[in-house]
Amino acid sequence: MAHPKRKMSKSKRDSRRAQTFKLSLPGIVECPQCHEMKLAHRVCKDCGYYDGKEIVSKEN
């Protein structure tokens, strides 16, 4: 079986591992109706529109 020739430092080991555990950012886009930031492919929490149609009626 293969054995490491040199001891790997903790910082070298951890920096290599950090690449696999990266978190991806959620897709945040601007709402075309009210221009607020919202999650992509979801109803806007401010105006209630999705794909140009009013899904949730927002009453003031």
Curated annotation (Swiss-Prot):
Keywords: Ribonucleoprotein, Ribosomal protein. Belongs to the bacterial ribosomal protein bL32 family. GO terms for cellular component: large ribosomal subunit. SUPFAM superfamilies: Zn-binding ribosomal proteins (SSF57829). This is Large ribosomal subunit protein bL32. GO terms for molecular function: structural constituent of ribosome. Pfam families: Ribosomal_L32p (PF01783). Coiled coil: none annotated. Disulfide bonds: none annotated. The gene is rpmF. The keyword Endoplasmic reticulum does not apply. It comes from Clostridium novyi (strain NT). One of its GO terms (biological process) is translation. InterPro entries: Ribosomal_bL32, Ribosomal_bL32_bact, Ribosomal_zn-bd.
